[in-house]
Amino acid sequence: MRPADLIRQKQNGRTITILTAWDSLSAALVEAAGADAVLVGDSLAMVALGHATTLPVTLDQMRHHTLAVSRGFAAAPSKQPLLICDLPFLSYQCGADLAVQAAGTLLKETPAAAVKLEGAEAEVLAVIDRLVRMGIPVMGHLGLTPQAVHRLGYRRQAEDPVSQERLLTQAIALEQAGCFALVLEHVPSALAREVRRRLLIPVIGIGAGDDCDGQIRVTADLLGLTEQQPPFSPALIPGQQLFVEALRTWIAAQTPTTTPPPATPDY
């Protein structure tokens, strides 16, 4: 799977499905489930590394986890899901040169075929233009952008007409800068529908309603493995509870059923 294949899926009216992975086991699960693409998201900072936000994860950690994810794929390379890697905080906000180096490192040293970054400020658009001209496929991300949590929080975005018009303008700018797809997170469904109507590239929703070209979810949320569930991504199973109960069953089975005989001294 390549970035151009996602565009063809939009053109053919086929819904795109993207799930996150953070190690070889989670990658094997989402590949077996049939996801079109796998995102090694900076959410692994919270899911795998125990941080409270996505901000602390480093480029080297993203590279490490992307390699681990790639080892979990069982299919031949041409049949594997599209592998996308998040550019972590401060790997692209400090200029195009640093961004090219960061994205180039990920694509050179891992099997990732694309990177994702957040925002559409003038500086970010310049970075995207540079990356695309260097041959690096880029997925955009608007709405709730976790790397801006200290400024925007985790609340729903673009709820008033002015901010909705701004987001639509940003989405068009991202397409013009060369993005092959756009993630819209936690925005009104009517806005996502209009963005989808205006763009030729796929619009992938998470908390943006059903009228998108595809959907993306954090796998740990769907499996019920996280302590706090996002309101737009309810768990499909009580995974944490099931796993704890299974482990407790094993631990209980190790308790001796009879009292051992008293120890005999060696003297």
Curated annotation (Swiss-Prot):
Reactions catalysed, semicolon-separated, are:
3-methyl-2-oxobutanoate + (6R)-5,10-methylene-5,6,7,8-tetrahydrofolate + H2O = 2-dehydropantoate + (6S)-5,6,7,8-tetrahydrofolate
The enzyme class is: transferase
Q: How is the cofactor bound?
A: Binds 1 Mg(2+) ion per subunit.
Keywords, in A-Z order: Cytoplasm, Magnesium, Metal-binding, Pantothenate biosynthesis, Transferase
State the GO CC annotations.
cytoplasm
Catalytic residue positions: E185 (proton acceptor)
Q: Which cofactor does it need?
A: Mg(2+)
Residue positions binding Mg(2+): D42, D86, E118
Q: What is its EC number?
A: 2.1.2.11
The subunit field of the Swiss-Prot or TrEMBL record says: Homodecamer; pentamer of dimers.
Family per record:
Belongs to the PanB family.
Q: What does this protein do?
A: Catalyzes the reversible reaction in which hydroxymethyl group from 5,10-methylenetetrahydrofolate is transferred onto alpha-ketoisovalerate to form ketopantoate.
Q: What is this protein called?
A: 3-methyl-2-oxobutanoate hydroxymethyltransferase
Q: From which organism does this entry originate?
A: Parasynechococcus marenigrum (strain WH8102)
Its gene? panB
